[in-house]
From Swiss-Prot:
Protein family membership: Belongs to the Hfq family.
NCBIfam families: Hfq (TIGR02383), PRK00395.1 (NF001602)
A GO molecular-function descriptor: RNA binding
Upper classification of the organism: Bacteria, Pseudomonadati, Pseudomonadota, Gammaproteobacteria, Pasteurellales
Primary role: RNA chaperone that binds small regulatory RNA (sRNAs) and mRNAs to facilitate mRNA translational regulation in response to envelope stress, environmental stress and changes in metabolite concentrations. Also binds with high specificity to tRNAs.
Residues of the Sm domain: 9-68
Gene3D superfamilies according to UniProt: 2.30.30.100
A Gene Ontology BP annotation from the UniProt entry: regulation of RNA stability
Protein name per the record: RNA-binding protein Hfq
Region (Disordered): 67-96
Organism: Pasteurella multocida (strain Pm70)
Disulfide bonds: none
Length: 96
């Protein structure tokens, strides 16, 4: 489960921290708008004129009003590990 959230958490946290307005599209087509107040593994608390708790399993897409700069060191190390694995696999194939 941690691998699935390695991009999600820093992205949502950047949206929350920078108070970037977002449009959240649900799987049934409904569009919600507001700012991300908080989130956890299962829900996002969206703040507009009222607070709404939106279950993540109901979300299709999160669209920020402007671009977001999120930095994910764990994602970079995952990418490096992946590249090292690919290189090792390639070397093993050549040796065979």
């Amino acid at each position: 489960m941690a691998k699935g959230q390695s991009l999600q958490d820093p992205y949502l946290n950047a949206l929350r921290r920078e108070r970037i307005p977002v449009s959240i599209y649900l799987v049934n087509g409904i569009k919600l708008q507001g700012q991300i107040e908080s989130f956890d593994q299962f829900v996002i608390l969206l703040k507009n004129t009222v607070n709404q708790m939106v279950y993540k399993h109901a979300i299709s897409t999160v669209v920020p009003a402007r671009s977001v700069s999120h930095h994910n060191n764990s994602n970079n190390s995952n990418q490096q590990n992946y590249q090292q694995e690919q290189q090792t696999d390639s070397n093993v194939e050549k040796a065979e």
